[in-house]
């Protein structure tokens, strides 16, 4: 059996700066869609999926300012909701599984959220129906374009309504998406 021998007596000094985590920062980045105020986020990891999502947010009309390494400011005061239905969004959104996280904030603030069938990492079973079933419990109508593999939800004219929610499976991403959809009700 392998083992380590640790000889004490030497004090440790210094700082440890942990890198931001991809899955958490994708959720945080999408939350900027909930407000028109400027939001500053630090410790954003320089990872392909994170950079793709920042680019998608910019395509939506979010003003993105890079303040320094891992330090960005976002202002979502001129969102182009019609971007949801364009080919650019369908292509870019399909290449990033985390793009499902734009649905909740867009639904909450603009009354509609859509996503192409997402790609991204093929690790395990990660259902989308959990997200959409709960959006419907908040009063949203589910929309699916079969030929385009395009999913969406639209809020009723009188807006979303709070509801008691119990997910049929554990889902960190689903929970974050649902909280963002419900936060403005």
Where are these predicted regions, by residue range?
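Structural preference for solvent-exposed beta-strand-turn elements
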Residues: 1-185
């Amino acid at each position: 059996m392998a083992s380590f021998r640790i000889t004490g007596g030497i004090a440790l000094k210094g700082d440890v700066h942990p890198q931001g985590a991809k899955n958490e920062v994708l959720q945080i980045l999408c939350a900027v869609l909930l407000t028109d105020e400027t939001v500053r986020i630090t410790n954003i990891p320089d990872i392909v999926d994170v950079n793709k999502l920042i680019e998608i947010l910019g395509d939506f009309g979010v003003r993105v300012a890079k303040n320094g390494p891992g330090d960005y400011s976002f202002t979502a005061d001129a969102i182009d909701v019609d971007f949801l239905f364009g080919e650019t969004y369908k292509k870019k959104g399909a290449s990033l599984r985390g793009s499902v996280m734009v649905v909740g904030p867009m639904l909450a603030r603009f009354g509609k959220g859509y996503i192409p069938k997402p790609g991204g990492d093929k690790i395990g079973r990660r259902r989308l129906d959990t997200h959409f079933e709960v959006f419907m419990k908040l009063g949203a109508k589910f929309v699916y374009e079969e030929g385009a593999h395009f999913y969406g939800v639209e809020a009723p004219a009188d807006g979303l309504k709070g509801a008691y929610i119990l997910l049929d499976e554990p889902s960190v991403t689903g929970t974050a998406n649902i909280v963002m959809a419900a936060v403005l009700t």
